């Protein structure tokens, strides 16, 4: 087993402990944040072009500032749409409201801000890499190992489990940073997240080369997708079982439920049964998209566990129609099952045979009507993309085959241009054509 796989497997094994001990938010905020300006010197990360003799690009600041949406996140709060959301919520100025600042900038406590720190920088370096107070100077020294920087508070973004926990804090919400249904009701855009896809959105400020691998271990996109699905599913259950964050009065926090279970036109007659829920029409159901995707992961790793996940997911859905106690008990049982399976997922070698199993399992679910909602189909499309890229990286397909598959993948995404005009049958046809063209 390679070192990177062992590290990921160990961190996944410790998933429940990590959730209970130090969250990603707490880890990021553990040390003083010195500000983006402390990283943007032209001989550090603020160069205008890539340094050829450096183990990092050194123009990371320019890439972030010019092309990364994170750099513009704070500025969005002063837009008319943001001001209207804040007005509806009754929280005052969006550029000063904690619930907005927590995700639209680096909202570290005032006592933890260095002299060059600026809230207006948006989601900057230390929002993801952790407070640089102890590692800023050390990480520039080539003689200092990456592990030493991590020990000084640098956040382990190369570890897919910890990266997923970090990203979910804002891209879906966690128990210590809840993004509630009230925020959505006030007009905030729907949230969606998939680790592998979102890691590569936009222009990356790093290159996975031999030097990167030597310092941080192998990179495997499908494994990142798989681990990310497991962490996202665990995060849902973590919130659902938290009496303070996951419940509002007698109801679970509604943001944990599927948007499209309720948000349909009254004239819509598209309801149909889903094997994955076992529920009838007119029932508000949990957003189980990550649980469904993780079942496709397990199809390639442990078929028995995949069946167990299906049964326990159905039991959770059933429990939500019974009582609060039944829901929490079912969620805890399912979360335990996830924790037991994830070390095997992290250690699994996703070869061409595994990729075929995953893609076939997704296509089979599509044909039986499991992706009845837009958000489920969206997750299936991102999963298919990770699989296709992995086929290419493994050498299982040549350039011509890869181009053909990407054409089929484009057709899948074309069915997802709008959630208002989305057609399940069109998606089924597109994903079937993609599967037929795969190796």
Which role fits each region the language model picked out?
Residues 364-371, 375, 379-439:
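A cross-kingdom marker for long, charged
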Residues 23-26, 48-87, 115-123, 131-381:
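Primarily the internal scaffold of c-type cytochrome electron-transfer domains
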Residues 37-45, 101, 126, 168, ...:
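Cys/His/Pro-rich metal-binding microdomains
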Residues 87-126:
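Post-signal peptide N-terminal segment of secreted/secretory-pathway proteins
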Residues 32-41, 93, 97, 122, ...:
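Residues immediately within or flanking Cys/His clusters that coordinate Zn2+
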Residues 1-5:
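Positively charged n-region of N-terminal signal peptides that target proteins for export
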Residues 22-42, 46:
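Short N-terminal segments immediately surrounding and downstream of signal-peptide cleavage
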Residues 8-17:
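Bacterial N-terminal signal peptides
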